């Protein structure tokens, strides 16, 4: 799989979430890119560390984080500050086809021919 994202401080978090969803949870690349993301830290001029979770995440996820003492804040989905990822996955035992994915948080599109 080749993939990347723009997004400054959020790049490692976005790349990790996409890779984990493909490798560990078996999502295709578009599903992995589309899924709600989390952003922790100080980003894009914030004055303090924040834990942002896109609002498309289940409410139970917000509740569980709050119960553990995390001051999580909802971020509108799609939230461009979460980075805009693109990916291509080569054929393998999981699929005989190439897979492409583009982030709905940006202006890309995945096309095949």
Q: Model-derived features: where do they sit?
A:
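Cofactor-centric catalytic regions
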Residues: 53-113
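Proteins synthesized as precursors that undergo proteolytic processing into mature forms
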Residues: 1-76
């Amino acid at each position: 799989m080749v993939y990347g994202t723009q997004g400054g401080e959020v790049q490692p978090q976005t790349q990790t979430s996409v890779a984990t969803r493909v490798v560990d949870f078996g999502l295709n690349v578009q599903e992995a890119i589309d899924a709600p993301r989390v952003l922790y830290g100080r980003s894009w001029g914030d004055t303090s560390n924040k834990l942002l979770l896109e609002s498309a995440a289940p409410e139970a996820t917000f509740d569980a984080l709050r119960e553990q003492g995390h001051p999580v804040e909802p971020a509108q989905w799609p939230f461009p500050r979460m980075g805009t990822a693109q990916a291509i996955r080569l054929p393998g035992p999981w699929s005989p086809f190439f897979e492409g994915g583009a982030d709905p948080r940006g202006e890309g599109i995945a096309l095949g021919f």
